[in-house]
Amino acid sequence: MSLFKKLSLLATGLVLTTSPVLAQSSSESSQSGSTQTSYESLEAASNELTPKLKEALDLKDAKKTLDNLAQLFKWEVTDSKESQLANSDFKYTIHRLGPEAVLLSTPDNKVLAFAMAKLDADTIRQRMAGLGVKPEAQMERLLNREPSPVDKVFVETKDFGLILSGHRIGQDEKKPDKPQYDLFVIYNHDFYKAMVKDFE
C-alpha cells in the first residue's frame, strides 16, 4: 500500500470518526433536513466565506479559532477528544464543530489541522484560495475529471504540508454532475512528518 493511500486512511479516518455527516451514507445524508439546511447555508455564503474563513483561522490560538468558526458557521463545539499518533509522542485534540467541520489542536493550543466535509470541487477551490493555497495542475485535472465512486486527491504544498480532498460522500441534488469532497488541511509540518513516520 502506498504512503498516500495509508495517509488517506488516517486522514479520512479522523474525519469519519468525528463527523456524523461522513459517517452516514449518501442516501441517509440526502434525507437529513438539518444536513441539507446546513449545506445550503454554506452554499449561500460561499461568495463571501473564503476571506472570512481565512480571517477566522488563527494558527497560534486554537481556542480563538474554534470560537471564530463557531460564530462564522453558527455551529457549536459538540465534542473534544484527546488522541495520539500510534508510533509517535505527538498528542493532539480533535474538536468537532457542528455537523461538517473538525479542528485538530496541540496541547499548547496551536492549530494542527482543519477539515470540512460535504464540499463540491468548486467550493474546495474557493476555500483553498481563501487560505492562500493555489491548487496545483494535478489537483485541477482530478477535480475536473469524471467522478469515481471513491476519489482521493493529494496535494503537497510548501506552506501547508498535506492537503487532502476528494473523499466523495454522495451527490448534491442541486448539482448531480458534481461530486462531493472533503477538505483536510494540515498546517503543522512536524505533525505531517510524524504521520509519515507512522507509516514507514
Language-model features, listed with the residues they occupy:
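Short, low-complexity, Pro/Ser/Thr/Gly-rich segments in the mature regions of secreted, periplasmic
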Residues: 184-200
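N-terminal secretory signal peptides
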Residues: 55-94, 100-101
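Cleaved targeting-peptide boundary
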Residues: 24-39
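Bacterial N-terminal signal peptides
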Residues: 10-18
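Second-shell loop/turn segments in exported
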Residues: 50-59, 111-118
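Long, charged/polar, surface-exposed segments that mediate recognition or autoinhibition
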Residues: 96-155
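Sec/Tat signal peptide C-region and signal peptidase I cleavage site
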Residues: 19-23
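Bacterial N-terminal signal peptides that target proteins for export
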Residues: 1-8
